[in-house]
Amino acid sequence: MDREALLQAVKEARELAKPRNFTQSFEFIATLKEIDMRKPENRIKTEVVLPHGRGKEAKIAVIGTGDLAKQAEELGLTVIRKEEIEELGKNKRKLRKIAKAHDFFIAQADLMPLIGRYMGVILGPRGKMPKPVPANANIKPLVERLKKTVVINTRDKPYFQVLVGNEKMTDEQIVDNIEAVLNVVAKKYEKGLYHIKDAYVKLTMGPAVKVKKEKAKKK
């Protein structure tokens, strides 16, 4: 996908969006073609680390005890302790709110069976099962990576929509982030980006701007 076309779409999306009293996010939307999304192997569900970050940090919760919980507190993350796991399993409404409020979960590895039993029914279908780490792990590097990470998830639909930054970032930074997303899609399918039918860029409250396709070169 042509970089200049992406830059033009980002520029237009910025110009067409009315000013708001909050920082709007940039979103990238792509529709897919000639892919049978009924087949699980054709679906995309993967994480992408954006080179310039998400524009807003991912919200992360840590499920653990001792040193792991202490690290999470020092990093300003939500902490869910061992004794809360069963309680949350019995309070589905509260668990749903927690799942909705957080982008990623990290958990002490030896607590995963307990988490699966009591929290899996809510976290699993949402693609938010925790990333297991040893009880003595230094989670700061993982947290820093996750803060810049977005998830592409098509499920069984021939399209995806993903966060690629915010309006305070430059057009070049937004396009760098979009290209990081496109690189993942290109590696997923044998014909790469051929399978992208149309692509759009938009701000939170603005209209979607279609990315112009490259004109076929004359032979």
Swiss-Prot record:
GO cellular component: a single term: large ribosomal subunit
GO terms of molecular function: rRNA binding; structural constituent of ribosome; tRNA binding
Keywords recorded for this protein, A-Z: Repressor, Ribonucleoprotein, Ribosomal protein, RNA-binding, rRNA-binding, Translation regulation, tRNA-binding
Gene3D superfamilies the UniProt entry points to: 3.30.190.20, 3.40.50.790
CDD domains, per the entry: Ribosomal_L1 (cd00403)
InterPro entries named in the record: Ribosomal_uL1, Ribosomal_uL1-like, Ribosomal_uL1/biogenesis, Ribosomal_uL1_3-a/b-sand, Ribosomal_uL1_arc, Ribosomal_uL1_CS
Protein's UniProt keywords contain Acetylation: no
SUPFAM superfamilies: Ribosomal protein L1 (SSF56808)
GO biological process per UniProt: regulation of translation; translation
Pfam families membership: Ribosomal_L1
Domain of life: Archaea
Family (UniProt): Belongs to the universal ribosomal protein uL1 family.
Family annotation (HAMAP family): Ribosomal_uL1_A
Biological role: Probably involved in E site tRNA release. Binds directly to 23S rRNA. Protein L1 is also a translational repressor protein, it controls the translation of its operon by binding to its mRNA.
PANTHER family assigned: 54S RIBOSOMAL PROTEIN L1, MITOCHONDRIAL, LARGE RIBOSOMAL SUBUNIT PROTEIN UL1M
Assembly notes: Part of the 50S ribosomal subunit.
Protein name listed in UniProt: Large ribosomal subunit protein uL1
Source organism per UniProt: Methanocaldococcus jannaschii (strain ATCC 43067 / DSM 2661 / JAL-1 / JCM 10045 / NBRC 100440) (Methanococcus jannaschii)
